[in-house]
Amino acid sequence: MKRVLLILVTGLFMSLCGITSSVSAQTGGSFFEPFNSYNSGLWQKADGYSNGDMFNCTWRANNVSMTSLGEMRLALTSPSYNKFDCGENRSVQTYGYGLYEVRMKPAKNTGIVSSFFTYTGPTEGTPWDEIDIEFLGKDTTKVQFNYYTNGAGNHEKFADLGFDAANAYHTYAFDWQPNSIKWYVDGQLKHTATTQIPAAPGKIMMNLWNGTGVDDWLGSYNGVNPIYAHYDWMRYRKK
């Protein structure tokens, strides 16, 4: 009987270890991405569908490109009258607590968003957890920080930059820990959140899109295209 019990306990322990290893394997480690070429082992491009609701465009892989300047460029284009294509790049793996940094130059135009964020949700079989750095193209002298925990948001915070982010590259970051999120601009702390902190690992995402029905937030998109957001590099340091 003791031997049978030992076998059962050992089997359960090995099973749990397997589950733990599987979860760990799905969560990526520290890395630096210079965006000199496209790494399909690390990234994937959204293609052929729309998020709907306030997103007034279709994601196209062709709207994510690498330039001769050694940067990733996301494009907002119009293939036909009043139809719009946009660009989104996201990690293959999910990532958890740590420091997320990006050196980027957002697009400038009313009615659009350029972003850097982590996201996971029901399509991944998890709660909707998200941490955002967003630039509203109507005023790129400000940056918006936000986060969602199990679908609950309303944590928006605007920070004045003291410069126009669309004119030159700057470094933006957030340090995500179990009890806090801290957002930085060029190494300077701009905002700290300490309540309802998300816990589920998410994919690293960057996108450029035009909105509809959210004019109070973004302003009305005027159809100007092509428009570009530029990403020089990004880095994740696991903590």
Swiss-Prot record:
Record-stated family: Belongs to the glycosyl hydrolase 16 family.
SUPFAM superfamilies in the record: Concanavalin A-like lectins/glucanases
Species for this entry: Bacillus amyloliquefaciens (Bacillus velezensis)
EC number(s) recorded for this UniProt protein: 3.2.1.73
Transit peptide recorded as keyword: no
Location of the active site: 134
UniProt-listed NCBIfam families: BGlucanaseBglS (NF047856)
Name listed for the protein in its UniProt record: Beta-glucanase
Top enzyme category: hydrolase
